[in-house]
Amino acid sequence: MGNEIKDFFKTYSDFVTKVTSDPSLDLDALMERLKEIDTSSNIKSARLLTAAMGLGSETGEFVEIVKKMYLQGKPASEENIFHMKRELCDIMWYWAKACAALDLDPHEVIAENQKKLEARYGEQFEVQRSEVRKEGDL
C-alpha cells in the first residue's frame, strides 16, 4: 500500500476516533454509563445490549436468506422458508428480551405500533404518507 493511501486511512482513523464517544472508546467509561442508565431508569442495560445485538444479528441472518433467494438464485423452497421461520423465531425472542429490558408490555408495544400506523396511513397505505410524515411521527 502506498504512503498516500496509508496517510489517508491514518487521517480517517484519527477522525473516527475524534468523533467517537468516550463510552465507545473506553471500557471504564462504558461501565460508568451502563451503571448510570441502570440506576436512573427502569432500563436493564445488560438485557437491552443483548437484545439490540441479537436483533441486529438475527435480522441480518434473515435478510441474508432473502438476498440469496432474490439476488443469487437460492430456491424459494420449503427448506428455505423454514430457515426464514427459524430466524423470525430468533428475532421474536430478542424482541421480547428488548421489551423486558425496557419494562414494556409486549401487547402494549404491538398496540402502539398499530396506533402509530393507523394515524399515519388511515385505512390504506399511501406512498406520500410514508415519505412525508407529520411532525412527531417517528
What kind of region is each of these model predictions?
Residues M1-L88, M92-L138:
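Flexible "arm" and connector segments at domain edges
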